[in-house]
Amino acid sequence: TGVQTCALPIYPSRVTRQTVSEFVGSLTRDKLSPASTARCLSAVRGFFRFLSQERLIRTSPVTDVTVPRRWLRLPKTLTADEVDRLLRVAAGKMPEDLRDAAMLELLYATGLRVSELVGLEQAQVNLAVGYVLVRGKGDKQRVVPMGEPARRKLDAYLEEARPVLLKKRTAPKMFVTRRGGGLTRQGFWKLLRVRARQASIAKSISPHMLRHSFATHLLDHGADLRSVQAMLGHADIATTQIYTHVERARLKQLHRERFPRKARRLRRRNP
């Protein structure tokens, strides 16, 4: 795969807000995807934040520049009911059932990336206090609470399923197969699709959809944006702000479907 280059054509000290806006516009004209455009803007914003912190420039010209709303691709999420159905399907007592139940519950409870989930090691999980130490992008670490339901599912998996899957072998990875190795990203994608079908979820589901659902449902229930940013491991809060657009879009759709005056016309009274 190629490396995407995000570069402004002049010296940083001469960059203005208009320069950055024109740069973002050029990315669109070059037919860069909305996600790639947002990533480029995030990289530029981080660079100028660094220059500002080092006092090499007075103010960042990127602070108020955003990707136009029409470019944003809203993340797809599951409803609360769909999540409940998905988390209930792996209710069996087979080792794989207990493992799948623990993985699904933990993924939704923490908003981990799939790579972070399958790469999780036992030493990173503290069941006593209910926290996970996550190694994210760029080897950055963050601590994320898991909640009681996920803690119980993990405890059951560790006590009843993991020893059976490993037999007498040892493995550093938390989630393992009967061969003794760690479950791969592809393996988790496969089991997620199987469990989604069992839960009668018609959507094309992906692990990242559970991460999106985690963030969206937290914000729906009053969580503040900075806390969600910290739990997701986003370097730039602009990345987290996309979830506020999801809530606005949902409310707009709800209003369109449920507002009682949607199909009525106001009648003018005769003077």
Protein language model annotation of sequence segments:
Residues 1-5:
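Positively charged, low-complexity/disordered segments
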Residues 7-271:
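Conserved catalytic core of the tyrosine transesterase superfamily
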